[in-house]
UniProtKB/Swiss-Prot annotation:
Compartments in which it is found: Plastid, Chloroplast
The protein's name in its UniProt record: Small ribosomal subunit protein uS2c
Stated family: Belongs to the universal ribosomal protein uS2 family.
GO cellular component labels: chloroplast; mitochondrial small ribosomal subunit
Organism: Ranunculus macranthus (Large buttercup)
Single GO BP term: translation
């Protein structure tokens, strides 16, 4: 895999607060190699390591996108939800930003059935057929459609398991991460100072609580995906 330049600079990361970890009492000792200092009871993340692993992740997603691979971005906590959706839409990736439904990947046949139901209901609504049903039936199906839109809206065009999964918060999305590990799907994970760096294929040490930090990391990754997609289209 060729290494590329992704314009990752430490000053920009500091401004976004990428270096702020959790309180020193709330940490995982396995994160020690990624911590550079303690300040006012908070662990400070070594941004040189962040830049290195973010660059590696950008190389990986560029390479995958240039070969037409599919991505899923997962981040369901309130602080991450909007950034996840906008980043995914920009790079034409699938995403989950509300709630991870257990078995979404490991029980793919059930997810696929739900997606078919979702697509059918959307088509029925677009053609106005739901409005011609008895009031009670129409209300029930509209509620069902709203529920499916909330939880499956970001993966409505997904036709199979993703090739790479990007996870915004390891602890919050632990179920999703375990499903990827079970299925052997490569993962890229933002890891704060309370996380386990050994669980993902590429772990990017970063503040996973600040919106600016999450947005910066996702922006770099989706820029690399977009470049890779352009390369794929040119070479087809």
């Amino acid at each position: 895999m060729i290494r590329r330049y992704w314009n990752i600079n430490l000053e920009e990361m500091m401004e976004a607060g990428v270096h702020f970890g959790h309180g020193t009492r709330k940490w995982n000792p396995r994160m020690a190699p990624y911590i550079s200092a303690k300040r006012k009871g908070i662990h400070i993340i070594n941004l040189t390591r962040t830049a290195r692993f973010l660059s590696e992740a950008c190389d990986l997603v560029f390479d995958a996108a240039s070969r037409g691979k599919q991505f899923l971005i997962v981040g369901t906590k309130n602080k991450a939800a909007d950034s996840v959706a906008s980043a995914a839409i920009r790079a034409r990736c699938h995403y989950v930003n509300k709630k991870w439904l257990g078995g979404m990947l490991t029980n793919w046949s059930t997810t696929e059935t739900r997606l078919h139901k979702f697509r059918d209901l959307r088509a029925e609504q677009k053609m106005g057929r739901l409005n011609h049903l008895p009031k009670r039936d129409s209300a029930m199906l509209k509620r069902q459609l709203s529920h499916l839109q909330t939880y499956l809206g970001g993966i409505k065009y997904m036709t199979g398991l993703p090739d790479i999964v990007i996870i915004v918060d390891q602890q919050e999305e632990y179920t999703a991460l375990r499903e990827c590990i079970t299925l052997g799907i490569p993962t890229i994970c933002l890891i704060d100072t309370n996380c386990d760096p050994d669980l993902a294929d590429i772990s990017i040490p970063a503040n996973d609580d600040a919106i600016a930090s999450i947005r910066l990391i996702l922006t770099k990754l989706v820029s690399a995906i977009c470049e890779g997609r352009s390369s794929y289209i040119r070479n087809r």
